[in-house]
Amino acid sequence: MTAIVPVITVDGPSGAGKGTLCKALAQALGWHLLDSGAIYRVLALAALHHQVNIDSEEALVPLAAHLDVRFDAAEGDLRVILEGEDVSTAIRTETVGNTASRAAAFPRVREALLRRQRAFREAPGLIADGRDMGTVVFPDAPVKIFLDASAEERAHRRMLQLQGKGFDVNFESLLAEIKERDFRDRNRAVAPLVPAVGALQLDSTSLSIEQVIAQALAHARQTLV
């Protein structure tokens, strides 16, 4: 029964460091990992591949309901598999990210993917990375964390990440995109980006990733005792 399987939810905006934190928590505890944002990115990529109108809720719902996606963390790094193909890199572009955010604004699309996300809850436990994990997907999770950082810091991190991969990027453009996405995510009618009640709130703007991991892990272990 999934009701007794513990879940640690980690919510927050893009670029706050959720992915790194969740991988560290999963490794430290030996738990499964769900990158819910990747599911929406996979849906966006699938829509682009199959030429489905990303602004049509009616067209996206059946695609979401039959989305063939799985996560493979056997080799350490989280691999995202869509229809048998490793799309871990392909889903991380800004275009796919912005498309995913638009798709996530549709209530019926979110409902179609909700059951699939909950199916990742298996023993011994699950680390759930997303934007509404603690408020909507796993409201009964015993440990909830909200990780944030300033838009400027997140844009800087994203710029360094993309430059490291050989992309030519502009800081001001990235900052504008992040602020636009933040506004959309925080103000949407369904499942807006807000800290869950009782969540540990961490601001990583001036914290090292090691400090963030240490605080989150200490909180989780204390709560789960």
Swiss-Prot record:
Keywords: ATP-binding, Cytoplasm, Kinase, Nucleotide-binding, Transferase. InterPro entries: Cytidylate_kin, Cytidylate_kinase_dom, P-loop_NTPase. It is found in: Cytoplasm. One of its GO terms (molecular function) is ATP binding. Disulfide bonds: none annotated. Pfam families: Cytidylate_kin (PF02224). Belongs to the cytidylate kinase family. Type 1 subfamily. This is Cytidylate kinase.
